Amino acid sequence: MALTRKPNNYLNFEFYSTRGINYSSFSLTELYSFEHFSEIRHRALYSLGFFLCTTIVIFSNIKFVVKILKNSVSMIQF
């Protein structure tokens, strides 16, 4: 009789710190406070970068944006 492993419904997560230390031996699904702050910092920097790039693109094409707004306002009659 061959022994078979019963499949479980749990995912085996392994989280690695940014300093190269493996914390998965302590807890499989828990991030420590340093990793939380690091993740928040990365997301904030990506959001800021996206906002700055979008702002630069919009201001570089400001004449086109003003043209669209003027056309839409000129069609309104009071």
Curated annotation (Swiss-Prot):
Membrane-crossing ranges are 44-66
Q: Classify the protein's membrane topology as the record does.
A: Multi-pass membrane protein
UniProt subcellular location:
Plastid, Chloroplast membrane
Q: Which UniProt keywords apply?
A: Chloroplast, Membrane, Plastid, Transmembrane, Transmembrane helix
Instruction: Kindly report the protein's main subcellular placement as a broad class.
Output: plastid
Listed GO CC annotations: chloroplast membrane
Q: Which family does it belong to?
A: Belongs to the TatC family.
Question: How is this protein named in the record?
Answer: Uncharacterized tatC-like protein ycf43
The record lists the organism as Dictyota dichotoma
